[in-house]
Amino acid sequence: ESAHSIRFLYQHFLSGITEKSLNVFYYACSYAKVDYSRFMNTTVRITLKLIPDSLQTQPVFLCVDDTMVSKFGTKFENVSKLFDHAAHNGCNYLNGHCFVSVMLCVPAWNRDKVSYLSVPLGYRMWQKKESKLELAASMIRQVMPEFHSKDHVVILCDSWYTKQNM
């Protein structure tokens, strides 16, 4: 299940680990001068610690993807006309936002077999001033120092990400 809002996160998680009110989190998200990109680094460090010793030599995967979110109104900030190659509705364009995301997949044991846990690290909303490739590269550069002890970090992405230097 995805987190739909700050309220959802508060009701299902944050209220169980702190006595702070919901308004504190609203305020922090709105006004605090926080470098949220550092959360990606912290998430990587915590996730890498979850890998069992017996699987430390297995590769980890950084997955990069983009996704589009349709908007039906016209007054949304940064809304654009986007090409949707996967559209099956007769029109390859939609009005909306495009997000580029990075996810970390780490090995874990599942019934005596290796399976991979997927942990979202971060996402950025694409705007015309910066390409999706530049957004992806920026997020990858942000987290790569956390992998200094890993020998096998594989980046997985759609083929068009490799058309230019990342």
Predicted regions and their residues:
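Conserved, well-structured functional cores that handle cations and Mg-NTP chemistry
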Residues: E1-M166
